[in-house]
Amino acid sequence: MTRGWRAGTVQRLEEVPATIADGLRTRFVGERNLAVMRQYVYDMTTVAEEEIVATLRFVWQRLKIIIEPSSAVALAPLFTGRYPAPGRRVGVILSGGNVDPFHLPEEITGAHG
């Protein structure tokens, strides 16, 4: 997604990357989505798997909300400082429609099997 947005053209990956954020796992972003992103997205960054898990854990422990990993990807740059926004109001939509609480990593829920 980031490669295509930066290049301004569809970038196809040979393999689908492994990630906990399965809602974002794709070989490429289509032409229409890329056009919308190029028009409205100001900047884009990536986050590591560990940062996704840390964000999931934070939201669960502090807000008592289970969000899907793809949703955590949108919030993680604020926690890591990749999107610095001191003193600014920032809106992030958190969703949980694509999550199976029984398959969340143990480090998020604190469950021991």
Residues of each region from the PLM?
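PLP-dependent amino-acid enzyme catalytic core
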Residues: M1-G113
